[in-house]
Curated annotation (Swiss-Prot):
This is Succinate--CoA ligase [ADP-forming] subunit beta. The lineage of its organism: Bacteria, Bacillati, Bacillota, Bacilli, Bacillales. GO terms for molecular function: ATP binding; magnesium ion binding; succinate-CoA ligase (ADP-forming) activity; succinate-CoA ligase (GDP-forming) activity. NCBIfam families: PRK00696.1, sucCoAbeta. GO terms for cellular component: cytosol; succinate-CoA ligase complex. Its cofactor is Mg(2+). InterPro entries: ATP-grasp, ATP-grasp_succ-CoA_synth-type, ATP_grasp_subdomain_1, Succ-CoA_synthase_bsu_CS, SUCC_ACL_C, Succ_CoA_ligase-like_bsu, Succinyl-CoA_synth-like. It catalyses: succinate + ATP + CoA = succinyl-CoA + ADP + phosphate; GTP + succinate + CoA = succinyl-CoA + GDP + phosphate. Its EC number is 6.2.1.5. Residues 9-244 form the ATP-grasp domain. Pathway: Carbohydrate metabolism; tricarboxylic acid cycle; succinate from succinyl-CoA (ligase route): step 1/1. The keyword ATP-binding applies. The keyword Ligase applies.
Length: 386
């Protein structure tokens, strides 16, 4: 789950991580009032959307008086920002962060991620702040320093100090930087983050170390124990189809293709998308119905897939282990009748009760194309949607 920058900074502040003073605004008048309350000579007006690259897209403006705050707020609110992370459709700005300006001396990068290679949380830091860390990794990887964190003892002070010295934090500010990193790590662990990025971390003219931007993502599987984080959820920033899918414990991610996929198991779902691509098709979604799908779940899955107008055909690829193929067949039949399916449907079943499942599909009298294998199914659906 993603949250907005201002929410991330609010959370960081609770853990003693230094951030600039700021206020959220949902209207132009609120933005001006927020700037008045901050009382800063310079304010930054920042669009709040779940995507990076806002500055380049015109979503971050520096205002030197209240008139400029009003002008920029009016300009940004309601605007659709298109960045490298939003896709061509962009995201509409519905809220702003009005933040006090600061005298930036130097920009750095600090981030925490899960490293699959070591199965550990890793803190990364670089003195190349303010730019995409992926770009730094590609062009100058020697400028990125890492500390692998032992989960038993957590991030240690000496590790934070080593990072601070490696990225050339001024010696007199190393203590602040260490406190910052330790606080950030505490947030990451205690709040079940999957990513915590501060880009840029800055040193200021008045001798402070603070987060100028904050990106915190959270493990959705841990939200049951993170009620406070769940309250930060902004449904306006999420795909309506993904929201609907979550109500039925379906894992759904929208893609750009025209072949709807309904599969059980994340691995099989990814393999299904791969094989569709292999046969020159384009998947319209990732949809994992899970191991305990019912006829109701399958019906809802069909409805969600069909709510995407770009879908021209559906490929159902099920391996019945925990889930029985006859139950899936019943769900497919029920869903096909209920939604009045008018586009091609290819079904591949394998596993528990597969013969019974295939028999039910054959006897349904519906226009369902059976597939003998995953490759056969992919070829059939690709040819049917052309």
């Amino acid at each position: 789950m993603n949250i907005h920058e201002y929410q991330g900074k609010e959370l960081l502040r609770q853990y003693g991580v230094a951030v600039p003073n700021g206020k959220v605004a949902f209207s132009v008048d609120e933005a001006v009032e927020a700037a008045k309350e901050l009382g800063s000579n310079v304010c930054v007006v920042k669009a709040q959307i779940h995507a990076g690259g806002r500055g380049k897209a015109g979503g971050v403006k520096v205002a030197k008086n209240l008139d400029e705050v009003r002008t920029y707020a009016d300009e940004i609110l309601g605007k659709t920002l298109v960045t490298h992370q939003t896709g061509p459709e962009g995201k509409e700005v519905k809220r702003l962060l009005i933040e006090e300006g600061c005298d930036i001396q130097k920009e750095y990068y600090v981030g925490l991620v899960l490293d699959r290679a070591t199965s550990r949380v890793v803190m990364m830091a670089s003195e190349e702040g303010g730019t995409e860390i992926e770009e730094v990794a590609e062009k100058t990887p020697e400028k990125i320093f890492k500390e692998i964190i032992d989960p038993v003892v957590g991030l240690q002070g000496f590790q934070a100090r080593r990072l601070a010295f490696n990225i050339n934090i001024p010696k007199e500010l190393v203590g602040q930087a260490v406190k910052f990193m330790l606080g950030l790590y505490k947030v990451f662990v205690e709040k079940d983050c999957s990513i915590a990025e501060i880009n840029p971390l800055v040193t200021t003219g008045d001798g402070k170390v603070m987060a100028l931007d904050a990106k915190l993502n959270f493990d959705s599987n841990a939200l049951y124990r993170q009620k406070a984080i769940l309250e930060f959820r902004d449904l306006d920033e999420e795909d309506p189809k993904e929201i609907e899918a979550s109500k039925y414990d379906l894992s759904y991610i929208s893609l750009d293709g025209n072949i709807g996929c309904m599969v059980n198991g994340a691995g099989l779902a990814m393999a299904t998308m791969d094989i569709i691509k292999h046969y020159n098709g384009e998947p319209a979604n990732f949809l994992d119905v899970g191991g305990g799908a019912t006829a109701e779940k399958v019906t809802e899955a069909f409805k969600i897939i069909l709510s995407d107008e770009s879908v021209k055909g559906i490929f159902v690829n099920i391996f019945g282990g925990i889930m029985k193929c006859d139950v899936i067949a019943e769900g497919v039949i029920q869903a096909t009748k209920e939604v009045g399916l008018s586009i091609p449907l290819v079904v591949r079943l394998e596993g528990t009760n597969v013969d019974l499942g295939k028999k039910k599909l054959e006897e349904s009298g519906l226009n369902i194309t059976a597939a003998d294998s995953m490759a056969d199914g992919a070829q059939k659906i690709v040819s049917l949607v052309k």
